[in-house]
């Protein structure tokens, strides 16, 4: 919809739709994040045309839910062209020329297919109902976490912000990987729990660390057990010894973590870790 006078001054939904569209008429338009007045002044404004629906996306299809790659993909392309350009001047111009510019020799050796609106397809890898619910819950939790992070970021020390930023990044990457089918839901939970265990340890949040570190080990044991079961169910040949050794090593590590949480249990904790290391050594020797 349109918002009348608001559209003329501010970055309204209509104006921002144009910014995210790949249609020829809308390309590189409406940069203003708050005031659209700047685009009107500098000639980059384009009003949304009711006869031409905005098609969202990028001209180089990302085809990924990876938040890291979504931010790095453009720079990776620039670095590729800069590296392969034969002229030193072209190596520099890659970084300062308008979007889409490429050295002639690079474009000849590494041609890109011409953009076509017919190629614009929604990136929608198949997801089971369980993964869809997992993604919904995870997104709600991550959105809450990002909100809490932004709320306190200006008063927290830089080191604390860096740690929590890394935790949120791991969480978002893991969720995207699950949605693409690259890792399982259990693997994502293990990575997220490990990130929280590391963060709470670094920040001295002992009680929370006592929760997340054993939880990480417990999820790892379940992950190994389910992997061993699925391998056995598929009838894949091979010894079960490595699986048993790995589960025993993880179990010993988990026991060591739990023992060390309580005063007076240092020796049992130390013994548990030593036993776990013996199982790890046996696992490595088994190949």
Task: Tell what function each PLM region has.
Residues 2-138, 176:
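Cytosolic/stromal cytosol-facing helical appendages immediately following the last transmembrane segment
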Residues 3, 124-134, 156-160, 185, ...:
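Membrane-interface helix-boundary signature
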Residues 5-6, 35, 174, 205, ...:
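Alpha-helical hydrophobic/aromatic positions enriched in membrane-embedded helices and signal peptides
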Residues 41-44, 143-153, 278-285:
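Short hydrophobic alpha-helical module
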Residues 189-287:
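Polytopic alpha-helical membrane-helix bundles and their juxtamembrane interface segments
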Residues 76-82, 110, 138, 160-168, ...:
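Hydrophobic alpha-helical transmembrane segments
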Residues 47, 149-153, 178-181, 227-234, ...:
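Perimembrane helix-loop junctions in membrane proteins
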Residues 125-191:
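Substrate-recognition/cap regions that form aromatic- and gly/pro-loop-enriched pockets
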């Amino acid at each position: 919809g349109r918002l009348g006078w608001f559209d003329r001054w501010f970055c309204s939904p209509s104006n921002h739709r144009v910014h995210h569209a790949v249609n020829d008429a809308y390309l590189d338009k409406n940069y203003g994040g708050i005031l659209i007045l700047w685009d009107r002044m500098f000639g980059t404004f384009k009003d949304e045309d009711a006869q031409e629906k905005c098609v969202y996306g990028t001209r180089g299809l990302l085809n990924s839910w990876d938040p890291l790659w979504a931010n790095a993909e453009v720079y990776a392309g620039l670095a590729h062209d800069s590296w392969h350009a034969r002229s030193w001047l072209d190596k520099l111009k890659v970084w300062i020329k308008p979007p889409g510019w490429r050295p002639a020799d690079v474009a000849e050796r590494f041609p890109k297919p011409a953009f076509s609106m017919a190629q614009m397809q929604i990136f929608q890898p198949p997801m089971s109902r369980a993964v869809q619910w997992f993604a919904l819950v995870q997104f709600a939790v991550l959105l809450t976490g990002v909100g809490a992070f932004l709320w306190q970021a200006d008063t927290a020390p830089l080191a604390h912000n860096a740690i929590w930023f890394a935790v949120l990044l791991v969480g978002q990457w893991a969720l995207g990987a699950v949605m693409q089918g690259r890792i399982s839901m259990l693997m994502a939970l293990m990575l997220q729990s490990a990130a929280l265990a590391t963060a709470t340890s670094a920040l001295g949040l002992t009680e929370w660390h006592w929760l997340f570190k054993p939880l990480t080990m417990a999820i790892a044991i379940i992950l190994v057990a389910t992997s061993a079961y699925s391998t056995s169910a598929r009838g894949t040949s091979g010894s079960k010894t490595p699986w048993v050794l790995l589960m025993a090593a993880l179990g010993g590590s988990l026991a060591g973590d739990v023992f060390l949480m309580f005063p007076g249990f240092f020796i049992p904790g130390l013994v548990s870790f030593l036993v776990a290391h013996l199982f790890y050594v046996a696992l490595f020797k088994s190949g």
